[in-house]
Amino acid sequence: MKKFLALALALVMALSLAACGKKADDNNKGNGDEAKGSVYYLNFKPEADKAWQDLAKTYTEKTGVEVKVVTAASGQYDTMLTSELDKSAPPTMFQVGNQGAVNSYGDFCYPLDNTDVMKEMTTQDFNLKNANGETVSIGYCYEAYGIIVNKALLKQAGYEITDITNFESLKKVADDIHARANELGFDAFSSAGLEGSSSWRFSGHLANMPLFYEFRDDNVTSQPATIKGTYLDNFKNVWDLYTTDSATTGAALTTATGDTSEAEFGQGKAVFFQNGSWEYANLVTSDDKGFKMNPEDLAMIPIYCGVEGEEKSGLCCGTENCWDVNKNAKEEDIQATLDFMKWVVTSDEGTTMLAEQFGPCPFKNAKTPENVFFADANAYTAAGNYIVTWAFNWTPAVDDWRAGVVDALTQYTVNGGSWDNVKTAFVDGWATQYAKENG
């Protein structure tokens, strides 16, 4: 943790990256030779699909090299990646975002040490390696998430951002706004939808809170076979708040999508919206969405959940965005992919897109993003607040584990089930998935 915080301050913000692997045996790969093959990128983030499609088109126009971008549906990346890698024309470029995925996909990952794209990196300290010590997955951006706040609406309700410093004060403000929703014309929280395009925010990102604090207390430094669920009551605190102080409650949560929640916030119908720095472009600059929110009205605060000392917490910082190259692809396609990756991180077009869509990137030519959420993350760190790292990167069989948590949350929230079922899905589900993944 000390090393992490030190690096975070040195880099302005932490870069918590993930990876996978195989031995580097051809140092000529990615050293600038003209690619003769083609690129097939299986993209992880639906919200960045248009940006990647546009960039791919630009690269093809400039070089003549075909770049195909396919984007998996939210929550379906692992399933689609497994299927696509088995095809005769598999992805040449894909994403592996945590240590568990290293175990699953390591045999497909090309060693990236000594390639040009890796030489462009400003830090390699958080690039994960395989069992042989080879770097096979590089993190291309750093992200932060928390509770996004519409400060203008908050002020209309009679509050300032400084009034919220912990769970108690967050609940007090949210309860009051919800009670006056008809009068104010807006509610406290946007929909905490349990539909697939939204549920990852809670089975993954909100679930990180109890995992982070448990791992911090127990000095966990590698993927554990079991967890205790020490802070699940704190998870419940926030979940109950999200699903009570909102216009969308009960059965409606099962069909509320990520777009639904985003639109409620973007259209000024809610003060609070749990999401991340990647939402900035959608909220502020997107012509497609049409929100065009004023950046000065936006802020991001920590996810407060009632843990002692949380007044000194910062935002949740890290990344699941890590590039991998398919070592089983054709030689010319591997070369084309490495050349494309280098162009993305060095060209004006590529670095502009990365800054706008993803924020801070660990490359020499990276542009400084205008994203106000990173300014908030920096401010918390500069004030000495601790960073809430991405403990969920150690989740075993992540899609299956999260699906179990979502099912239990649905039973609890919609059907009046017991919170004990959520605890079972969380704790026992972890042990079950770990055993399946590790034999």
Feature locations, PLM:
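Extracytoplasmic/periplasmic solute-binding protein
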Residues: V136-Y140, Y145, K171-P224, A270
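A structural signal for short loop-to-beta-strand junctions that line the ligand-binding cleft
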Residues: E84, P91-T92, M118-L154, D187, ...
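Extracytoplasmic/periplasmic substrate-recognition and gating elements
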Residues: K62, Q156-A157, D288-E356
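Short, solvent-exposed loop/beta-turn-alpha elements that line the ligand-binding surface or hinge
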Residues: D113-F126, G193, L211-N237, D287-M293, ...
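C-terminal capping/gating helix-and-loop segments adjacent to ligand/active sites or protein-protein/ligand interfaces
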Residues: G139, E356-F363, N378-Y434
